[in-house]
Amino acid sequence: MSPQTETKASAGFKAGVKDYKLTYYTPEYETKDTDILAAFRVTPQPGVPPEEAGAAVAAESSTGTWTTVWTDGLTSLDRYKGRCYHIEPVAGEESQFIAYVAYPLDLFEEGSVTNMFTSIVGNVFGFKALXALRLEDLRIPVAYVKTFQGPPHGIQVERDKLNKYGRPLLGCTIKPKLGLSAKNYGRAVYECLRGGLDFTKDDENVNSQPFMRWRDRFLFCAEAIYKAQAETGEIKGHYLNATAGTCEDMMKRAVFARELGVPIVMHDYLTGGFTANTTLAHYCRDNGLLLHIHRAMHAVIDRQKNHGMHFRVLAKALRMSGGDHIHAGTVVGKLEGEREITLGFVDLLRDDFIEKDRSRGIYFTQDWVSLPGVLPVRSGGIHVWHMPALTEIFGDDSVLQFGGGTLGHPWGNAPGAVANRVALEACVQARNEGRDLAREGNEVIRXASKWSPELAAACEVWKEIKFEFEAMDTL
């Protein structure tokens, strides 16, 4: 035996593989206010005890590896390791468990969602001892929240910039999403804004393709915005998509948008990445631009019930990284969204303090302290008949975005925008008068359509349209 080996042995190092639960399962641990807390839905492989599976998640997402290493003795594992401190079975599921893990704050770089996710939702999701793993929720401690700028401006500052109060904001995604020339695209933007919408939107697929380069689109959309503003006397905006293949190109587009004097730009935060998104959010605050966020790719991550990551975690991450709007499900329409769960992460986006409420999928109390709120965006298969439900469910602090529900109007874009604006104003007035939109909504829309031919035509076109499928996102 060499002297070196003897030294290691005498120091107490013992090579080999040992159960994770001996080090990382600590049911007696009392969580600290500074810990990041995670709730994982764990599906262990057959024969793997839930305690070992939960401990493996804590280990592999913090300081652990598959075997004992002598360098463990050069640091304080008790200070830096993640701890699985509680496990509970999932009701109605035979082999699924919720494992609660606490992470010391020192494991994470300040102000970096990228670093936080690299640890918590990194290699551990491919771990062989687990059949599946889903991150259901995170508790971000105040000490970590305060290292983030968050949304560039937030809900109240946006309303002040736009001078729009007391109602949801109205938007529309320009269709067809691909193939229009820049000039025809700008024309569609102008007609929608002139008709009464607050915003129009680049589809997330629109970046800078051969049929419409980004600079041409920005110029024609800016022209449409200024023309519509002059005619209506209202502040208008178009979500100019700054998403690009490189961060440098993304910033070039944001700078050009600022030079044009438009109020808002857009970013695909999951396909673009959190580092790019946080960079853009910082620029937007410094330069007075609002930032609209699209969540393209989210369903790849969040749609399966037993593996991946719930959207409430992605919503929290966006609030930390930065965005003034984000698409967040409709409850009605064509896209996924179960009511109580959706309202849970809507509160996580908008409110300063959100209590734990398992009936809405909220596993931890979350305190955002001074981090600004994010406006949730409703889009996907919605039309004028949905307006009462959307107004009643989501209240004033939301953006209602009707793509086909505007551009599909039989008389064209501007009448489609008029129909949506009239329907919204009628619903807001009825609500303010104390009427029950859940019960009287259709009557409110019918009454308004008697003096708005544009709304009457829209009501006729979409009276039979429904999207009736069972929601996959259930508790």
Curated annotation (Swiss-Prot):
Cofactor: Mg(2+)
Prosegment residue ranges: 1-2
Position of the signal peptide: none
Gene Ontology CC terms: chloroplast
Modification N6,N6,N6-trimethyllysine occurs at: K14
Domain of life according to the entry: Eukaryota
Protein name listed in UniProt: Ribulose bisphosphate carboxylase large chain
